[in-house]
Amino acid sequence: IVTTGSAVTTLEPVVSPEPTPVVDTSKIKLSKKTMNLMAGKKITLKVTGTTSTVTWTSSDESVATVSDKGVVKGIKKGSTEVQASVDGIKLTCKVSVVAKMSKKDFDRFGITEARYVRGKRKVTVRKINFIYLCQKKGYAGKGGFYYTFQFKNGTGKRRYTNRGIKTGSKLSTIKKKYGDQIVVKKCSKKDAFSNMKLVKKNKAKKYTEVSYSKYKIRFFLNSKSKVVGIIVACNMKNIKKKHLKADGYL
């Protein structure tokens, strides 16, 4: 309080503003620098090392879009860059979008047929679209199912999917061809196919799948994340242990 003559002046205390915290931008990281994503699928990118608001952009939204929460969605086959801007810096993830699953993905695997020629068993592989076969034979209907497979230590000529995956391929190659959004699961006793003799013989520990409608391609992987078996199935959920046992595969 300052008194001047009869006047009294009250001085308010001076409050210094809080210093603006300095952000260590070297600690700010983006969860992925590169990404493979299937058209129609989504993967969420995350920024760590800061609490500031992040601004997300895609260099080509016709290929992939990104939401304000970092959710990247594949639109069509191609490449784009998703950028996260925060605290004065920009972080970039290169996104490669692969084509969505279609009937073409079931072209190459074919179907194994055994027949006898002059008393000798002859195994052949028919090059027929798996989906076409299932629809023609009625396997695609309610309650129906069908499957065919190839294992590393099985019999017959080694086959491959329409995107080039075969026994011996790496998990990283599967992700490159089908997208990082695929989920890897552990083999379980509850899962019918995980109990197959060939699954155990090849020491498969886990598997991943890609789907088109009611049709699936499953890749069995060993401890080194290499493909040891491929199963193509229609209405896989209808296939139980009793069916595999009756076919002699358990």
Mark where each language-model region is.
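Extracytoplasmic soluble-region selector
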Residues: 5-101, 120, 131-136, 141, ...
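Intrinsically disordered, low-complexity Ser/Thr-rich linker and spacer segments
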Residues: 21-25, 158-160, 238-245
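A cross-family detector of function-defining hotspots
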Residues: 102-143, 171-242, 247-250
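Acidic/histidine-rich, surface-exposed loop or edge segments in extracytoplasmic proteins
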Residues: 147-160
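Short secondary-structure transition/capping segments
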Residues: 162-168, 234-235
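Second-shell loop/turn segments in exported
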Residues: 98, 158-165
